[in-house]
Amino acid sequence: MAKLYEAVTFKDVAVIFTEEELGLLDPAQRKLYRDVMLENFRNLLSVGGKIQTEMETVPEAGTHEEFSCKQIWEQIASDLTRSQDTTISNSQLFEQDDNPSQIKARLSTVHTREKPFQGENCKQFFSDVSFFDLPQQLYSGEKSHTCDECGKSFCYISALHIHQRVHMGVKCYKCDVCGKEFSQSSRLQTHQRVHTGEKPFKCEQCGKGFRCRSALKVHCKLHMREKPYNCEKCGKAFMHNFQLQKHHRIHTGEKPFKCEICGKSFCLRSSLNRHCMVHTAEKLYKSEKYGRGFIDRLDLHKHQMIHMGQKPYNCKECGKSFKWSSYLLVHQRVHTGEKPYKCEECGKGYISKSGLDFHHRTHTGERSYNCDNCGKSFRHASSILNHKKLHCQRKPLKCEDCGKRLVCRSYCKDQQRDHSGENPSKCEDCGKRYKRRLNLDIILSLFLNDI
């Protein structure tokens, strides 16, 4: 009996899958297997025992791309070198209810490579019942361990422990390239693909590549056009529940993400992150041709399309072309007459949210854009940009009829209407026509004030 309590090496009691057995698992299941192996090993360290550091044999790596046996054992070996303990007794490796014959039988299967346990789904044989249970739970989808914070369920307690790092804010994994930290190794691996440009997950329908499987799943729903989540207020449909929850903030006005520097609030965390780069002046994306920096990749792409002159989105009604599908969508409302954005003050409708926001300032009198040179205030960012050109005497546009230099495109249009006599803005009450829509709006506002 005393012999059963002698010290042994970790490999004497560890049971691993062969490369053939690992070949039956997809990358996510292989990662879970690795995490379970590492978690079990760390649990052995945590009970205060000791483990011998010698690793006499390491299984050869197979042809699998992710997490071969060799990689798993190398991870365990690295943990061993960080540990100050060196041995653990057999009495700590097994449950108290195990009798000597059960312990002896379990150890003997490792040395003899006997595999008495067969999986019902995969028909593979395993040397230990605990590893027989691993694929059984993977196939059955049983998730008995639930997170108290968010309610998410997991097959294994070790997977739950890894998930709980997200709530605790523990970030053990650091990117060697940019220094960004992550709570899970899988998230670090996905992030590293940003630097390498690797996109291993391909769409079978269009061939588009993605860095992670979840992004591919979202993309595939675009082909299926499946949008099961509907907004009760406006009827807009979404592919995912989290998209619907974000959309609800438009109706409620909730802005939970606040900038610590200037106090500005945002509906989305991504919008806050983008805004914070304005304060840090961090522009990660550079134009190779012109050297101009941008906060995110989308802005760089928009800038490049300006120089290339690409306008792939065409209106079927009038033939007008646009750089972005969102611009085309807004433009089509001109033809359909749809004005989904309504002013609560006066009931006036607009085809875009930016148009409604601009209109709101006529009611509030807000002029949030101030000129540093003369102190003049403006309602819109584009107005102050055009105004600043007056101070620097910059007039990039030229009238084709008279050659007059002008500050902005709207002034150029006004000048051309002077030559042509065109007055496109018409008052519906009196029939009088105006050169600019702004002039008509001013007259209408004065008329309403008199009433």
Swiss-Prot record:
SUPFAM superfamilies according to UniProt: beta-beta-alpha zinc fingers (SSF57667), KRAB domain (Kruppel-associated box) (SSF109640)
Compartments where found: Nucleus
Ranges for domain KRAB: 8-85
Gene Ontology CC entries for this record: nucleus
Keywords for the protein's UniProt record, in alphabetical order: DNA-binding, Metal-binding, Nucleus, Repeat, Transcription, Transcription regulation, Zinc, Zinc-finger
Zinc finger (C2H2-type): 145-167, 173-195, 201-223, 229-251, 257-279, 285-307, 313-335, 341-363, 369-391, 397-419
A molecular-function term among this protein's GO annotations: DNA binding
InterPro entries reported in the protein's UniProt record: KRAB (IPR001909), KRAB_dom_sf (IPR036051), Znf_C2H2_sf (IPR036236), Znf_C2H2_type (IPR013087)
PROSITE patterns noted in UniProt: KRAB (PS50805), ZINC_FINGER_C2H2_1 (PS00028), ZINC_FINGER_C2H2_2 (PS50157)
Role according to the record: May be involved in transcriptional regulation.
Family in the record: Belongs to the krueppel C2H2-type zinc-finger protein family.
Protein name, as recorded: Zinc finger protein 222
Organism of provenance: Homo sapiens
Organism phylogeny: Eukaryota, Metazoa, Chordata, Craniata, Vertebrata
Gene this protein is translated from: ZNF222
